[in-house]
From Swiss-Prot:
HAMAP family: MTTase_RimO (MF_01865). Its main location: cytoplasm. Keywords: 4Fe-4S, Cytoplasm, Iron, Iron-sulfur, Metal-binding, S-adenosyl-L-methionine, Transferase. It is found in: Cytoplasm. Its EC number is 2.8.4.4. It comes from Wolinella succinogenes (strain ATCC 29543 / DSM 1740 / CCUG 13145 / JCM 31913 / LMG 7466 / NCTC 11488 / FDC 602W) (Vibrio succinogenes). CDD domains: Radical_SAM. Its cofactor is [4Fe-4S] cluster. It is an enzyme of class 2 (transferase). GO terms for molecular function: 4 iron, 4 sulfur cluster binding; aspartic acid methylthiotransferase activity; metal ion binding; protein methylthiotransferase activity. GO terms for cellular component: cytosol. Binds 2 [4Fe-4S] clusters. One cluster is coordinated with 3 cysteines and an exchangeable S-adenosyl-L-methionine. This is Ribosomal protein uS12 methylthiotransferase RimO.
Amino acid sequence: MSKKLHLISLGCTKNLVDSEVMLGRLKSYEITPLIEKADVIIVNTCGFIEAAKQESLSVLFEALERRKKGAILVASGCLSERYHEELLREIPEIDIITGVGDYDKIDQMVRERQGFHSGEVFLASEEQERVITGSSVHAYVKLSEGCNQTCSFCAIPQFKGKLHSRTLESTLKEVKNLIAKGFTDFSFIAQDTSSYLRDRGEKEGLIQLIGALDSLEGIKSARILYLYPSTASAKLIQAIQKSQVVQNYFDMPLQHIAESMLKRMKRGANQKKHKELLERMRQVPHSFVRTTLILGHPGESEEEFEELCRFLEEFRFDRVNLFAYSDEEGTSAHKMEGKLDKRVINARLKRLDKIIQKQHRALLKEMVGQEIPVILEGGSSEHEFFYSARDARWAPEIDGEILINETLLPQPAPGHYWAKITQVAGKQLLATLTRRWEK
């Protein structure tokens, strides 16, 4: 009887790629959705901000409580890297504690029941066989690890190190391997994608990647996430606009827009550049612009917050992620004066969220009546008689779901189609599948 594996991947999609590498190394195990049935339980942790750290610890304690006798519990990922010694000391019941450097050795660690902690940062390549999760159409591809930026609030460079890009050849080989397995839609990710290949002497590595993707057989759509304002360029926006494969999808975390706040946050670019990039993105036909904002950074004044509110109402992003400032040890912001009361931060979050939700409802209503390219993932997990799809521009999960409640095509398989948006139901769109999307 084969042994059973239960894996929980917390945090970002970059972490998910590493989880998929571990699944590839342990493919002889049968995956079980039940912790109690598992012989091996892996929690791939997140240690980015306080809320993520607390979630990781909570999941680890729950796994310890529910595991069967003799089951091996593994804690891997960012929390394990950042707080390796503390976890060893405080939770000795965890059998294997490993960080962000040895995902490809998980089979050996489980076999020997011993954690490795190499101190290096693992970067998945075409040489690792991943088990892609959640889709038979879409796969994430990680371009680099680490980050050369020095944002005041961010602890990631402490445990992920400096930028380390994989070669263009390596990236393309992995994409080709995934195409051969039937994947046709891709999301390219990194801490700072617009710095891709800069550590290898190439200033516009993403533009090279986009050109190469356009010449690949079998790829139908792709998008690039996590552009950084100081390294994104007008040339890059133009390359995305011209691409036949890469969608007009622009995900660029701003964190703030007030000039003084951008400087305090050490964002590396001024307000003028931020606004110029955003305007160029918005001028691209059918563009989809997403961002992330941090509220309550030390020193954020009422005037700076009001400026952010005004800008948000004027620009109208397609999607916005909001975060409350997390005071992380080891960051320059941690030492700053002017820390804000949590009640003030929460009030600001609530006000901005109200603006965002109002805009989101309006944007969904504007899509009604349009026929758009969509990616059909299969049956909806929430609605038994509906199919689950998304706008071809959208990234999985974070940008939303389109429910297909009617189809002009009999028993459509997962893949690329056209759909007509018929109505808004709550925060979701309903649509009719009309025809295949032939590239």
